[in-house]
Amino acid sequence: MKRLLTIIALAVAVTALNAQTPKDVKYSFTEASELNLIGKIIKDTPNPYHRVDTVKYKGFTKGENSQVRSSAGLAVLFKTNSSVISVLTEYGYMNKGVNTMGVSLRGYDLYIKKDGEWLYAASKANSVGKEDQNLVLVKDMDDSMKECMLYLPIYSEEYSVKIGIEEGAVIEAIE
């Protein structure tokens, strides 16, 4: 009986893992900072995902310095006709706090506009140790043009955030 339950559990786990990332999708990536990045306190920073230029503005404690380099409150506005939206992130500092969920520390929130209203579409974060992998946020959507708002991680620093769409689809900045 234990063996049967183990086999069933493994089959379910493998099926769930296969459902996460579409296998036959070829991705095209666009750096998020090339689209419309909103929510910044100071527009011109050496790293587009920092809220404050810590080279220019000194006097922060270690904790404050880490916080102003995180992307809390930043979002990317874009439109796409892709049926899949993913994110490929290069982290500078990735918070791994034990008292906060991974989706807050290093995850993304995606909203899609429908009938003039932003609707929640997905929240996801890569597992610890798999931060460099392509994170599929949504899949199996229709190929109509969708306006999207992607909130960046709250408690981590990013060097690069690339939005992945399927090859042949378009992605453009929106206001």
Residue ranges with predicted function:
Residues 1-23:
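Bacterial Sec-dependent N-terminal signal peptides
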Residues 20-175:
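N-terminal secretory targeting modules
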